[in-house]
């Protein structure tokens, strides 16, 4: 007992944890005692029993029988065996409590079955979905056997004409008190989620031993999947029913079969059940058990939770963008079709009135309409919310793209145009297409114009008023201000104060400040009046003194400039005074100060003002003292102390004023003397200016009188004619004749500075100019010294100027002489190196040194002084010391010069012709013309500073070829050419040169000859290695640095052997013959040997 009650108490808490168990349901026989529901019980669902239900359990039945005092009936084991054999698979229903599996081990032995052999075969199962969200109720009438109606008519709402069938339902009889009525709402969690299966037909065949008729197989019509079909829901008095169990129906008849098709209902997932449960007749059980109410409430709560959980979100499908093409003809055709369809519909409704129907017909039509509306609702509910929302949006978008034309609905507003349009619409079928389109267009225009007029007359309520940002800002400021004030008010009230009292005090203070400002203004006005009186008195005194001294300075004259300056200065002073007074008033108002106690020191001469001021002071004293600031009830407490404090202040201020008055009197006595003199000068100046003005006015009057007299005489006509002729002759180029007009022009005099008024000190000006010149000279000297130290002049040499800012011709000549002298000095310093210099001895470094020397040479005559560098290269057939057989070079030029060969430096000399033939590619075609031009240039310009041109440098270059002992003499060319750069004797030059008178005077020693190497070339091959000597130290030559720019790898070379006289002669003749035969060959054949090379 305790275990059973404990299982019932745990029913509500652990309802969700379910297990599933297959239980066989027996097939009942017709002969069994059945207790069906009467016709009054149509509203209640069929009562179900079986091993899978809660209250059909054996243990519960035992407990119930014991409580009621009844004995448990005997169980028939044989019937149990037959029942188990013939039982069919029933619905998979979970236990509603823990420990249900143990209780169901002892299965209840239900109602007795007949011993008839009933064979049943189920070919296929049926998917029966049940909706959770549907609130409608199916009332399945079950007719008992006692009524004589063995069949029941089942009609479902989901199917109109196909789902109703005559079913023969043999009902089973149960034991009294053994069965319980189970509320459909309590079995919400007994449903089993099963994957969706395609709706299939069910065929149930039953055979009986006592029946001779064969039962036909009736296939069930497959039904559509409808999302919200109601099935077996609760009674009206009960809560929201979500029963998902199928009403158990069995077909056990010999001649009858059942084909059941139940529509499907899904809540986001298709739920199926396979359920065949036998109907039983139950005893009357009270329906007012408390546990059933609790179960119904829990089931409704669970259903709500499942609804909230099972809501799925689906993305709205984006509309596929499609281009819509609109044309005038299609639009008009659609418009005409729509208007004609509407007219036809109206005519059909009027032509076919609705027939009068009876009450029965009305009732049947209503049921049919209800079924149709249920179907449409089901179809509508199948569509998810998001997809429907997306479809609505698409419709709105499509409608916005189209043009909507609203017709005038009011019949009273139709005019003649509308009537014409109606006539046109009637005659549209008669008119051709072209006329039809024009008519419709005109009709549309008329309608739209009327519609626009109506819209313009109506107030635009839909349009939002324009939002002004300034208004919004003002509202925000007001709101924020109000919020701040409220906050301040709360803070002040918390402190125990009141804003009203504070506002009153603030008003009082503001009123007092305004009174103070007004009082200060009055005081200032009084002071201005006094100042004006003083100025008037001062002007009268000055005028009197000026009249006395005017006679003394009558001979003193003033210019027109002084008069104009005085007038302008007077106007400026007046303007300044006015502006100062205005500024002072503004400052008083802004600063809100108290009264300024201005002290005026009155001289003895101003006795009248003192007399006027005294009665005013007395009148002020006689007036009662006005309280400037009303302190309220606090003023009485401060009164006595303030009187004492004022008395002490008055005594102190009187002492201070006496001391200040004494000082001011002494200062004023000194200033008055100066001021009187200045006043006298100004008065004299005014008088002179007035006199000058009178004189100018008199001159103008006299001039005008002269012009009037000339006009009367007729002289003006003659003058006009002359003026016209002069203008026509010169066209205004000559300008005005004669002196200028005598009229005074003040504007010009203002523009011109009058230095007579300025007092300049010439000594100060001279000192300033001298100081400026001195500074400039110091800067220039410092610059020159800096350039001398750091080589600034050397850098400026390329610009051919020292930047001394000297522009005269004489100074230019001096600069040229300076440059010449400087170059000569540099040249001498470089030539002092002499023959012992290592740079000159080394042929590789000598070229670099020569380039440095060439930087100093002036290029005045680059081609004129070549003759002194013409080298006499002769071929020696005998000893090198002999000069008899020397061949003179330069036969074309006529200047054949012979040079003695130094005995110390033994050299091999060859002729110039040989070198020219061997190096023909370096020689130009017009060589003779070039030589003649060179001679003429030498005679004309002289050879002060000669330099060789590119042609002579190439011509006088040296070529060396080294021969190995293994190579043939024919293939290898042993040509040793060297430049003879020795100085020629002056005697031979004078004898052989016929032009000594022109050239000899300007002749200078050659620069390049002094750097010629006097050593033998073969000396450096004595050791067998070609070496280069490197100097780590360097020598400065004319502020420049000498260095070695060539580095060579050491290589072993065989020095050439000195040849005899016979070999030299043979070698020379042999080469001459070869070169004569090969004059027309190409120049590149000179370098057939890879060992030939140029070397300095």
Swiss-Prot record:
Biased composition (Acidic residues): 336-346
Compositional bias of kind Polar residues: 181-200, 881-898
Biased composition (Basic and acidic residues): 68-85, 294-315, 611-620
Region (Disordered): 68-90, 166-200, 294-316, 336-365, 527-620, 724-743, 881-903, 1058-1096
Record's keyword terms, sorted: Coiled coil, DNA replication, Nucleus, Phosphoprotein
Recorded GO MF terms: anaphase-promoting complex binding
Low complexity bias locations: 547-560
Residues found modified as Phosphoserine: 144, 409, 411, 434, 605, 607, 801, 807, 911
Modified residues (Phosphothreonine): 609
Cellular compartment(s): Nucleus
One matching Pfam family: MRC1
Biological process per Gene Ontology, one example term: DNA replication checkpoint signaling
Cellular-component GO terms for this entry: chromosome, telomeric region; nuclear periphery; nuclear replication fork; nucleus; replication fork protection complex
Major localization class: nucleus
The protein's assembly and partners: Interacts with CDC45 in S phase.
Any further remark recorded for this protein: Present with 721 molecules/cell in log phase SD medium.
PANTHER family xref list: CLASPIN
Name of the protein: Mediator of replication checkpoint protein 1
Gene designation: MRC1
């Amino acid at each position: 007992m305790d275990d059973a009650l404990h299982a019932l108490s745990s029913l509500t808490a652990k309802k969700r944890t379910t297990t599933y168990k297959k239980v066989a349901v027996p097939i009942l026989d017709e002969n069994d005692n059945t207790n069906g529901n009467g016709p009054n019980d149509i509203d209640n669902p069929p009562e179900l029993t079986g091993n899978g239900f809660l209250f059909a359990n054996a243990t519960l039945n035992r407990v119930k029988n014991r409580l009621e005092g009844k004995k448990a009936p005997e169980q028939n084991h044989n019937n149990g065996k037959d029942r188990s054999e013939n039982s069919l698979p029933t619905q998979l229903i979970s236990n509603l409590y823990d420990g249900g599996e143990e209780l169901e081990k002892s299965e209840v032995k239900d109602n007795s079955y007949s011993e008839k052999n009933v064979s049943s075969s189920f070919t296929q199962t049926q998917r029966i979905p049940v909706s959770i969200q549907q609130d409608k109720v199916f009332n399945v009438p079950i007719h008992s056997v006692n009524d004589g109606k063995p069949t029941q008519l089942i009609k479902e709402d989901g199917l109109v004409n196909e789902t109703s069938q005559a079913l023969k339902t043999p009902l089973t009889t149960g034991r009294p008190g053994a069965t319980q009525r189970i509320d459909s709402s309590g079995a919400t969690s007994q449903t089993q989620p099963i994957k969706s299966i395609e709706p299939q037909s069910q065929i149930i065949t039953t055979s009986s031993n006592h029946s001779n008729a064969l039962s036909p197989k009736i296939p069930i019509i497959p039904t559509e999947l409808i999302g919200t079909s109601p099935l077996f829901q609760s009674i009206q008095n009960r809560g929201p029913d979500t029963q998902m169990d199928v009403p158990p129906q069995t077909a056990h008849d010999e001649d009858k079969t059942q084909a059941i098709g139940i529509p499907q209902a899904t809540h986001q997932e298709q739920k199926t059940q396979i359920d065949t449960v036998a109907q039983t007749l139950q005893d009357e059980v009270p329906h007012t058990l408390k546990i059933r109410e609790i179960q119904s409430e829990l089931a409704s709560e669970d259903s709500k939770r499942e609804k909230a959980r099972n809501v799925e979100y689906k993305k709205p499908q984006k509309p596929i963008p499609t281009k819509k093409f609109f044309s005038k003809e299609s639009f008009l055709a659609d418009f005409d079709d729509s208007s004609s369809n509407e007219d036809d519909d109206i005519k059909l409704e009027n032509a076919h009135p609705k027939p009068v129907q009876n009450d029965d017909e009305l009732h049947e039509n209503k049921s049919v309409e209800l079924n149709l509306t249920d179907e449409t609702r089901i179809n509508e509910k199948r569509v998810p919310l998001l997809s429907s929302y997306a479809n609505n949006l698409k419709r709105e978008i499509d409608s916005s793209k189209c043009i909507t034309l609203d017709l005038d609905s009011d019949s009273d507003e139709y005019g003649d145009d509308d009537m014409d349009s109606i006539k046109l619409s009637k005659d549209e079928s008669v008119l051709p297409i072209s006329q039809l389109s024009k008519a419709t267009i005109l009709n549309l225009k008329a309608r739209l114009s009327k519609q626009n007029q109506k819209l313009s007359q109506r107030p635009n309520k839909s349009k939002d008023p324009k939002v002004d940002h300034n208004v919004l800002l003002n509202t925000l400021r007001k709101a924020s201000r109000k919020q701040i004030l409220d906050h301040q008010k709360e803070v002040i009230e918390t402190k125990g104060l009141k804003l009203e009292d504070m506002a009153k005090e603030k008003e009082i203070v503001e009123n007092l400040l305004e009174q103070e400002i007004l009082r200060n203004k009055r005081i200032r006005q009084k002071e201005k009046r006094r100042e004006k009186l003083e100025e008037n008195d001062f002007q009268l005194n000055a005028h009197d003194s000026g009249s006395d001294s005017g006679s003394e300075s009558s001979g003193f004259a003033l210019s027109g400039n002084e008069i104009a300056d005085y007038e302008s200065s007077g106007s400026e002073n007046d303007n300044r005074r006015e502006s100062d007074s205005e500024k002072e008033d503004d400052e008083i108002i802004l600063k809100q100060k108290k009264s300024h106690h201005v002290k005026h020191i009155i001289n003895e001469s101003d006795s009248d003002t003192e007399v006027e001021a005294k009665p005013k002071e007395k009148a002020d004293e006689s007036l009662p003292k006005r309280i400037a600031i009303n302190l309220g009830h606090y003023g009485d407490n401060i009164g006595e102390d303030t009187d004492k404090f004022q008395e002490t202040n008055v005594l102190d201020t009187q002492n201070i004023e006496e001391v200040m008055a004494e000082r001011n009197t002494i200062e004023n006595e000194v200033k008055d003397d100066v001021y009187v003199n200045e006043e006298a000068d100004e008065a004299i100046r005014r008088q002179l200016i007035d006199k000058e003005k009178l004189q100018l006015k008199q001159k103008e009057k006299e001039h005008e009188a002269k012009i009037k007299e000339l006009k009367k005489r007729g002289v003006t006509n003659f003058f006009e004619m002359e003026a016209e002729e002069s203008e026509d002759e010169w066209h205004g180029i000559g300008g005005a004749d004669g002196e200028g007009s005598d009229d005074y022009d003040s504007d010009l005099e203002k523009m011109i500075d009058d230095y007579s008024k300025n007092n300049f000190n010439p000594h100060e000006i001279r000192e300033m100019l001298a100081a400026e010149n001195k500074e400039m000279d110091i800067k220039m000297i410092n610059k020159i010294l800096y350039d001398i130290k750091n080589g600034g002049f050397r850098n400026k040499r390329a610009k051919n100027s020292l930047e001394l800012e000297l522009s005269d011709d004489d100074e230019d000549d001096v600069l040229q002489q300076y440059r010449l002298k400087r170059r000569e000095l540099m040249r001498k310093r470089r030539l002092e190196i002499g023959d012992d210099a290592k740079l000159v001895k080394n042929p590789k470094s000598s070229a670099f040194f020569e380039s440095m020397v060439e930087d100093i040479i002036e290029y005045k005559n680059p081609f004129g002084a070549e003759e002194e560098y013409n080298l006499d290269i002769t071929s020696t057939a005998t000893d090198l010391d002999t000069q008899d057989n020397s061949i003179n070079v330069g036969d074309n030029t006529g200047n054949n010069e012979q040079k003695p060969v130094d005995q110390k430096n033994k050299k091999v000399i060859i002729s110039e012709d040989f070198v020219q033939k061997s190096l023909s590619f370096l020689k130009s075609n017009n060589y003779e013309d070039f030589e003649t031009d060179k001679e003429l240039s030498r005679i004309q310009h002289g050879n002060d500073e000669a330099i060789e041109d590119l042609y002579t440098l190439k011509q006088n270059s040296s070529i060396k070829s080294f021969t190995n002992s293994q190579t043939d003499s024919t293939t290898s060319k042993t040509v040793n050419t060297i430049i003879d750069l020795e100085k020629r004797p002056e005697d031979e030059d004078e004898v052989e040169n016929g032009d000594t008178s022109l050239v000899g005077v300007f002749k200078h020693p050659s620069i390049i000859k002094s750097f010629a190497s006097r050593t033998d070339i073969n000396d450096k091959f004595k050791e067998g290695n070609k070496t280069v000597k490197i100097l780590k130290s360097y020598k400065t030559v004319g502020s420049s640095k000498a260095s070695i720019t060539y580095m060579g790898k050491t290589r072993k070379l065989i020095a050439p052997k000195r040849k005899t006289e016979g070999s030299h002669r043979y070698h020379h003749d042999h080469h001459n013959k070869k070169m004569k035969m090969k004059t027309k060959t190409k120049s590149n054949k000179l370098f057939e040997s890879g060992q030939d090379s140029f070397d300095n």
